[in-house]
């Protein structure tokens, strides 16, 4: 746990020293395991353009998942996504107020201690005056450091890359990259700090943004031997 705290402080210092470049990206996600097959998930996110300043975005979402087996998982989710203009903390009027519904398939496979997660998602997105479809694919990789599996008292490194595609120009909408470390303290609490680069493509311009991300994951599972978790966000 001490090593995770040191890494967190170092990454915070790096982000603070580049305050104009780094935003903050905070995530709290929870999972309630109802049975061997069914779970309920929810997630809260808060993002800022500067390091814990100029907050411009939040999202609240949740879903229900069904586990076919340890390697195949289906999820139905919905959420509210709100974006504010730049220049302050939650400056009005809103830039975007979105309601979203999505269907998701997650497939896991293992190569010795290396864990791979393939996530496919189809999104239906409703805005005030428009509707859009979007399709996403994420490859997530995790490697436990001090244990063979990711479980209680385990440090790990993790990275993912995700592409966002639409059915309208410019079609390739976004690329999101993450690299970080994590620590699963016990069977219900995981802490994962890391770096995110999000690059957006539009018809007239393309722009990227750096974030310091901190994720806190809470899983409530009454089973004596809970399944090995693949670290990552609902988003």
Segments and roles (model prediction):
Residues 45-51, 79-90, 123-128, 162-168, ...:
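Sequence/structural signature of outer-membrane beta-barrel proteins
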Residues 102-105, 208-235:
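Outer-membrane beta-barrel "beta-signal"
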Residues 22-24, 56-58, 97-101, 131-137, ...:
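Residues that define the transmembrane beta-barrel architecture of outer-membrane proteins
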Residues 27, 39-45, 73-79, 106, ...:
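Transmembrane beta-strands of outer-membrane beta-barrel proteins
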Residues 20, 34-37, 71, 110-115, ...:
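Short loop/turn motifs that connect adjacent beta-strands in outer-membrane beta-barrel proteins
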Residues 109, 113-200:
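Outer-membrane beta-barrel transmembrane domain signature
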Residues 28-32, 62-66, 103-109, 122, ...:
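Residues on the lipid-exposed face of transmembrane beta-strands in outer-membrane beta-barrel proteins
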Residues 18-77, 81-84:
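Start-of-domain marker
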């Amino acid at each position: 746990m001490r090593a995770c705290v040191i890494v967190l402080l170092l990454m915070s210092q790096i982000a603070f020293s580049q305050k104009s470049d780094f935003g903050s990206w905070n995530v709290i996600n929870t999972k309630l395991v109802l049975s061997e097959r069914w779970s309920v998930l929810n997630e809260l996110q808060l993002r800022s353009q500067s390091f814990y300043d100029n907050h411009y975005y939040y999202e609240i979402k949740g879903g229900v998942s069904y586990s076919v087996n340890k390697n195949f998982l289906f999820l139905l989710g919905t959420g509210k996504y709100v974006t504010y203009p730049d220049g302050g903390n939650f400056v009005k009027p809103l830039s975007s107020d979105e309601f979203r519904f999505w269907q998701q398939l997650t497939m896991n496979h293992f190569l010795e201690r290396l864990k791979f997660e393939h996530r496919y998602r189809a999104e239906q997105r409703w805005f005030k005056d428009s509707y859009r479809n979007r399709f996403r694919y994420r490859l997530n990789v995790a490697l436990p450091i001090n244990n063979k599996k990711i479980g209680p008292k385990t440090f790990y490194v993790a990275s993912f890359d995700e592409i966002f595609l639409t059915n309208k120009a410019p079609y390739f909408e976004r690329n999101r990259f993450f690299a970080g470390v994590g620590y699963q303290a016990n069977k219900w609490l995981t802490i994962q700090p890391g770096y995110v680069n999000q690059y957006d493509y539009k018809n007239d311009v393309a722009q990227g943004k750096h974030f310091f991300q901190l994720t806190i994951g809470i899983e409530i599972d009454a089973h004596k031997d809970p399944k090995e978790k693949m670290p990552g966000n609902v988003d």
